[in-house]
Amino acid sequence: MRIVAILLLFCLCRAAEPRKSSPGVLRSQGNPSRSHGRGGRRGSSPVKRYAPGLPCDVYTYLHEKYLDCQERKLVYVLPDWPQDLLHMLLARNKIRVLKNNMFAKFKRLKSLDLQQNEISKIESEAFFGLNKLTTLLLQHNQIKVLTEEAFIYTPLLSYLRLYDNPWHCTCELETLISMLQIPRNRNLGNYAKCGSPPALRNKKLLQLKPQELCDEEEKEQLDPKPQVSGIPAVIRPEADSTLCHNYVFPIQTLDCKRKELKKVPSNIPPDIVKLDLSSNKIRQLRPKEFEDVHELKKLNLSSNGIEFIDPAAFLGLIHLEELDLSNNSLQNFDYGVLEDLYFLKLLWLRDNPWRCDYSIHYLYYWLKHHYNVHYNGLECKTPEEYKGWSVGKYVRSYYEECPKDKLPAYPETFDQDTEDDEWQKIHRDHPAKKHRVRITIVG
């Protein structure tokens, strides 16, 4: 028992030895100024970083100077920032207005990150002096209106982010939208959507037609006048596929004929093979109207009064075989309208007021190059001097060296170079050729 007691006493003495130094440790922690070693210097470094004299980090990475001033509750640009900065990170601050000449002294700036601030106004010369700026991030702010004029001073701008802003899509945005839709600006303003008016909410800026925003008729539709009578009007959607008839046999068909539609329905079932939109009031085809209907093979758009087809309207219709555009108001096709129709076989073009000038050349040469596409109805309606001519005849005369007054006189009964007759003959014989089979047996 004595031996056990001695051992316990010895253990207690050993355990009490470290506690003797603890008061000194506590004193050194309570007064860090007494510490002159490396540990003391490390402890003071965070204080220097967030000192009022230098609220932001300036560093060099891959030989390019950066200013990192994110999450500092800034409301303006500080005057003591270096002028030779190449990249400026100002995200997640409290900036509300970008004033004229705000960044004028940073002439070497390449990228400017202003996302997740509270920006609601950008003055016309806010980016003055930024001749070398290539990247500008303005997403997640409160911007409603902006014009092309603000970007006059950024000729090298190639990457612009504008999404998650409550864009007010009216005539004030016309110049900005026109700038974003220039083909070379394919990385400017992607994913930005309208926040108002309600009729255009969630519509991408790149899908809008700038001229529509300033059209008086469109304004009346977006901002209707209050009703005089107390009876509420029945609101019917302009484009709702539930108004159409869906047939499964013999093929998946959506019949939207004579439904008073003004736009292509946005909720077309993706497995539809045949779509009939004839005899409606669709005046133009917007970009990517049919991008979700991948299986579509037959599309009827006749008798709508279509005046314009966007070059990206048929994007995604790689399986389309038949397209009926007859009895509309088409005068020509913009370059690129037919580029995605790889397997097109039949194209109806009759009863359109085709205008024979240089703009018709794209359609003619596309058909000439895609000789497997059978078409009809490509006849000049205007100008008067070419009325009744086939478009092919007009294009050939366009490149003749003789002046117009020396061209041979064509009788008015000229039969369109027999293009339509040849098409009908080929179309008539086509089913018979499809059933011919040649079998070769190799011994």
UniProtKB/Swiss-Prot annotation:
Keyword Flavoprotein set for record: no
UniProt entry tagged with the keyword Electron transport: no
UniProt domain LRRNT: residue ranges: 229-270
Domain of life: Eukaryota
Signal sequence, renumbered to the chain: 1-15
Disulfide pattern: none
Pfam family, one: LRR_8
Coiled coil segments of this chain: none
Main location: secreted
Tissues expressed in: Expressed in osteoblasts, spleen, lung and heart.
Positions of region (Disordered): 20-48
Residues covered by the LRRCT domain: 165-216, 352-404
Subcellular location: Secreted, Extracellular space
Function, as annotated: Involved in bone homeostasis. Acts as a negative regulator of RANKL-induced osteoclast precursor differentiation from bone marrow precursors.
Protein name: Leucine-rich repeat-containing protein 17
Gene designation: Lrrc17
